[in-house]
Amino acid sequence: MGSFNFNLFTKTKKRLSYNALVYGAMGSGKSTLLKKLIEVQALFGDYVRILDPSGEYQPLVEALGGKYLSLDGRDGILNEFEIQKTDENEGTCWVQHVSKLTAIYRLRRQNQCGQNELNTYSKLLLDFYISFGIIPKDGKITQQTPICGLPSEYYPTMSDFLTYLNKRIQEYEPSVDAEHGELGKKFLLQADEVRSTYENLVRNYGSLLDGHTSIQNISQTQILCFNVYTVLKLEPAICSGILYNALMMYWDHCVRVGSRMKALYENREIAERDIIHSMVIMDESHHILNAQFVDCVRQMTVMAREMRKYFSGIVFATQLITDNLKGDNASTEEKAVQDLFDLATYRFIGKQTATCIPVLESKFPGMYTETELYRIPSLDMGSFMVTAGDQNLEVKFFITETEDHLFAGGR
């Protein structure tokens, strides 16, 4: 028996990307493994971003000097109107920002809005950002007119948008032209639908949604954890928007930091060993990556495919293999989750039920020997079958007394 040294961001001819998948039944040590990974990357000086669905990561995050924010409004707000750095091109960032807000709006309208209403919504957004001074009056966005990375208080809030909608509707003047007048009436009705939606959001969910982003210099925070325990209990139309916005903020961080590292490395200003990486952790991912939150699954798929370019990786964790691998009986949404998990280079498989063995054999033919497969149901706490590239290793993870105290709540 020897020691096991693991770095998520080691690249070889077989290990080409930095995504990982952790399976482990309750009590198998799945969350402990994730916390060990967080500790390691923090010691390396890398960035860590966590989605915490159970509220158990706070002691570790704070011990490592990180920031912990509950997204239910207790600790502050993530402003969905803040434009994230989701691409190296500012114009593309705007397009993706409108796409994000449109997706969230559609979710809040529970898919009851037609394409014409969505078109009106995107037009109102552009006019609003121009009136607010974020977008130039001609609507043209260039690298010389940055719209990303501004101080959080520079961006509008949900109540600002509601004020703009009220004013826009009150000041509307119908056209004397009959044809255009009819179009104007349709526009007015659609704009009023948008206004009504945001009025409800500000009145009933303002403490969660309406305000500037609470954490300043968020991209400079090494370890950041969003607690979504209470958020997951909200109605899906509200919950999905908050989760989607949180994912976009994490993606913003990866692109922003990764682009800087890429430029420094390609200009030979830093060596490969000096690159700062970003790791996103999603524990109990079955709470978010499911048919109820399809837009979140799509966004995570984009991130999983693109993060390698930005020296970043995602670690998904869930309990049973059968939670996500449904085989031929999977729905379209379930297949999307399966496709997402297929993007993982590393797999850590902890204790599973015996019924999972046929699923493993079918999903990963030839990947595991018969002996390895039949070891999985009898793995003890802290033991995992680790696959990295073309290697399988059975590894036992241990914790110190200090870690035992910090990891309390999920082991």
Q: What do these predicted ranges mean?
A:
Residues 50, 281, 317:
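Generic enzyme active-site microenvironment
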Residues 397-408:
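Short, surface-exposed polybasic-aromatic patches that bind anionic ligands, especially phosphate groups
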Residues 1-2, 9-11, 27-28, 55, ...:
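Short, glycine-/Ser/Thr-/acidic-enriched flexible segments
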Residues 3, 10, 53-71, 79-312, ...:
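P-loop NTPase motor domains
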Residues 242-245, 364-365, 402:
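Short, solvent-exposed amphipathic alpha-helical segments in soluble enzyme
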Residues 1-72:
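Glycine-rich phosphate-binding loop of nucleotide-binding enzymes
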Residues 74-77, 81-111, 292-398:
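Conserved ATP-driven motor cores of ASCE-family P-loop NTPases powering translocation/secretion/packaging/pilus
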Residues 40, 272, 336-339:
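Structural motif
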